[in-house]
């Protein structure tokens, strides 16, 4: 048996410390300001220091984590629903419909997602709802491509053909035979997009068109820290470290889910009948 590599335990250990600090920070108030504690350096009273308004940085990191994770998951769900629906529609209707939808996918792929999201979010006035809509309307394409390819590859398989000859409707075939094989294939992409969404949320927050103050958000925290970086560098460094760790954890989950994705794609089996 080979010795475990350092990377096999280092990142999980960092993630565990990350989780413990988040759990502690959630017990603190992220909004309460105290000007007499303004720009306090990290210490026993404030483990990560305070910002220019005297707010606890650890509390804002922890509550910003919840907000960013919630937004990222919401964007993933919306993107999944849109992408799967469009991908399956393209495969099922084929012909001109498939060509038109594929053209839209190609067009969306050729444009940088963050730039389109930036324009949409700014046009919608900023805020969390605008953020969700902008990133969902630009994030569905990858899911749609996988859904379309999976539906095309499975619709002529023996078990799908048998279900069709037995009188199964289009909706039944998609729900009972295509979708169960599609979801495992999307697991790796979901984990990867989770990390990408966190980065995009932070980027839009940094530019001031994402989550609005005084709500805590990592990108907005880094933007607020710019005028004070020379005297209080922890204001930008701490959320930057948490953003990095969060992205690395998402990449680690992507790598591990890749094994399950390969197994799911090797030999699709018919769905088990419900009792």
Question: Which sequence ranges carry the predicted segments?
Answer:
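Periplasmic/extracellular loop-to-transmembrane helix junction in inner-membrane transport proteins
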Residues: 32-77, 224-240
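Non-cytoplasmic
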Residues: 115-119, 123, 127, 131-132, ...
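Transmembrane-helix boundary motif in ABC transporter permease subunits
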Residues: 22-25, 72-106, 118
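C-terminal transmembrane helix and the adjacent membrane-cytosol boundary/short C-terminal tail
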Residues: 138, 184, 188-194, 233-275
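Generic hydrophobic transmembrane alpha-helix motif, especially the helices
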Residues: 47, 51, 92-97, 101-154
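N-terminal signal-anchor/first transmembrane alpha helix
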Residues: 1-32, 183, 248, 273
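Membrane-cytosol interface at the C-terminal ends of specific transmembrane alpha-helices
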Residues: 76, 88, 126-176, 185-197
